[in-house]
Swiss-Prot record:
Biased composition (Acidic residues): 9-28
Name of the protein this chain belongs to: Protein spire homolog 1
Gene from which this protein is expressed: SPIRE1
Role: Acts as an actin nucleation factor, remains associated with the slow-growing pointed end of the new filament. Involved in intracellular vesicle transport along actin fibers, providing a novel link between actin cytoskeleton dynamics and intracellular transport. Required for asymmetric spindle positioning and asymmetric cell division during meiosis. Required for normal formation of the cleavage furrow and for polar body extrusion during female germ cell meiosis.
Phosphoserine: residues carrying this PTM: 229, 292-293, 295, 506, 510, 563
Protein's organism: Macaca fascicularis
Domain WH2 as annotated: residue spans: 147-165, 211-228
């Protein structure tokens, strides 16, 4: 507590005064009883202060503070009183419903003015002062502070002197160090810790690999492939054999004189049994494998057929060759499916049609197994025709490849790519007034002259055969087939073959005139197809039909020649041959 030694020897207000107890109280009672005038009161009040000269200023400040507090209390009570009166008036207004007259009186009232100010402040927003903007005066003016505030100000500014406190007749020692330093000393007094380098930690357990890391390792690891010799690869590519190819090999071996008649008979019987025994499913090869196998087959046929002269046939267009390369993804046994033409029909046709009576005489009566395979081969399953979806995919790939040819001509390439130029004629440009037609097959814009109408189903395309779209294309294929027949007639020296040609023609017509049922074509609608796509479809249909017809002809021809040179049955061994109704 702030305490200074008084000059007049008056009692102190500190702890010693509290310890003196009843003696001080008795002295105060005597002094109070001795007060008889205002001067005695002033002297008594001045004795409470450390210096008597500050008494007038101090008590004037106290009086001012008390007066200010009383005035504030008076104004507050007046406002409360006026607010109560106004509230009573409002209640009376609600009762009397005379709001129009009372509102004019309330305009001049204080509470209405204050309410307007409050609403204005709420609308505009009240700006609060920051703490830094407040200027705190450490030495305020005396008359602005109350005695309690003045005392707290003295304590904050440390304007006081403390008494010496004695403990057991001696001054207690001060704390030499702070609590933080004591804690640090305690930590240092403990035994030292081992350095990190000297510690031996346990090995970290292996972290399990995540799924992403395992997938990446499998991708980076090389696949272990089974070693395959090149002979097996060649054998798997060139393993597709027909009875005609085995017969050609037998004929070439007979011309060279390397085999006897006994080995020839055994070879023929084994060659005829191969189609019946080897019945496995073939997967559709990719375009790269087809190209590689085609190049190998062409080199092989060039080496084997060096002595024979192939007849002259007109070359088929490029689109037909590409379309015939792509096989349908349907799996058929080799014995029951004739292989489609792949730039080899002239050689096959030549090998069949160039037969001589000397070669035919070497045939032996076929066994039951070989005759059954011949019957299956004579009437193969009509699976050579591609589906509509496959043809659409082939056509779109060809159109995309055809578009890449025009990359060197930037104007034409950009016009074709953006659909501003006809894709067929490449002369007609499209504008705002001349619209384009979109081909439903190749999905390319074409002009009205290059657009044709064609009946197409809505969907699905995956199971629908391609020959169902265009019977007219089939008729064109038949006419082209008939035009090719006279050119190959002089290659058939056998009269027996010519004798059975009339029957085969009638049967071929019945096979070729197969059309899609009209009941299933009722819901088909006419759609726009470009000229190139229509020609492409007709060529695919004609080529597939042509290969099917040729396969049927070869099978029937071989069966007829074998039955012709077989020994005639006796009267007891007579057995009627099994023939279909169409043959009869």
């Amino acid at each position: 507590m702030a305490n200074t030694v008084e000059a007049d020897g008056s009692n102190d207000e500190g702890y010693e005064a509290a310890e003196e107890g009843p003696e001080d109280e008795e002295d105060e009672k005597r002094e109070i009883s001795a007060i008889r005038s205002y001067r005695d009161v002033m002297k008594l009040c001045a004795a409470h202060l450390p210096t008597e000269s500050d008494a007038p200023n101090h008590y004037q400040a106290v009086c001012r503070a008390l007066f200010a507090e009383t005035m504030e209390l008076h104004t507050f009570l007046a406002k409360v009183k006026s607010a109560k009166e106004n509230l009573k008036k409002i209640q009376e207004m609600e009762k009397s419903d005379e709001s129009s007259t009372d509102l004019e009186e309330l305009k001049n009232a204080d509470w209405a003015r204050f309410w307007v100010q409050v609403m204005r402040d709420l609308r505009n927003g009240v700006k609060l002062k920051k703490v830094q903007e407040r200027q705190y005066n450490p030495l305020p003016i005396e008359y602005q502070l109350t005695p309690y505030e003045m005392l707290m100000d003295d304590i904050r500014c440390k304007r006081y002197t403390l008494r010496k406190v004695m403990v057991n007749g001696d001054i207690p020692p001060r704390l030499k160090k702070s609590a933080h330093e004591i804690i640090l000393d305690f930590i240092r007094s403990r035994p030292p810790l081992n350095p990190v380098s000297a510690r031996k930690l346990k090995p970290t357990p292996p972290r399990p690999r995540s799924l992403h890391e395992r997938i990446l390792e499998e991708i980076k690891a090389e696949r272990k492939l089974r070693p395959v010799s090149p002979e097996e690869i060649r054998r798997s590519r060139l393993d597709v054999t027909t009875p005609e190819s085995t017969k050609n090999l037998m004929e070439s071996s007979m011309v060279n004189g390397g085999l006897t008649s006994q080995t020839k008979e055994n070879g023929l019987s084994s060659a005829e049994q191969v189609p019946a025994q080897r019945k496995k499913l073939l997967k559709a090869p990719t375009l790269a494998e087809l190209d590689s196998s085609e190049s190998e087959e062409e080199t092989l046929h060039k080496s084997t057929s060096s002595s024979s002269v192939s007849p002259s046939f007109p070359e088929e267009p490029v689109l037909e060759a590409v379309s015939t390369r792509k096989k349908p993804p349907k799996f058929l046994p080799i014995s029951s499916t004739p292989q489609p033409e792949r730039r080899q029909p002239p050689q096959r046709r030549h090998s069949i049609e160039k037969e001589t009576p000397t070669n035919v005489r070497q045939f032996l009566p076929p066994s039951r197994q070989s005759s059954r395979s011949l019957e299956e081969f004579c009437y193969p399953v009509e699976c050579l025709a591609l589906t509509v979806e496959e043809v659409m995919h082939i056509r779109q790939v060809l159109v995309k490849a055809e578009l890449e040819k025009y990359q060197q001509y930037k104007d034409i390439y950009t016009a074709l790519k953006k659909g501003k130029l006809c894709f067929c004629c490449r002369t007609r440009r499209f504008s705002f007034f001349t619209w384009s037609y979109t081909c439903q097959f190749c999905k390319r814009p074409v002009c009205s002259q290059c657009c044709k109408k064609m009946r197409l189903p809505s969907k699905p395309y995956s199971t629908l055969p391609i020959f169902s779209l265009g019977p007219s294309a089939l008729q064109r294929g038949e006419s082209s087939m008939r035009s090719e027949k006279p050119s190959t007639a002089h290659h058939r020296p056998l009269r027996s073959i010519a004798r059975f040609s009339s029957k085969s023609k009638s049967m071929d017509k019945s096979d070729e005139e197969l059309q899609f049922p009209k009941e299933l074509m009722e819901d088909w609608s006419t759609m726009e197809v470009c000229v190139d796509c229509k020609k492409f479809i007709s060529e695919i249909i004609s080529s597939s039909r042509r290969s099917l017809v040729l396969a049927n002809k070869r099978a029937r021809l071989k069966r007829k020649t074998q039955s012709f040179y077989m020994s005639p049955p006796g009267p007891s061994e007579y057995c009627p041959s099994e023939r279909t109704i169409s043959e009869i």
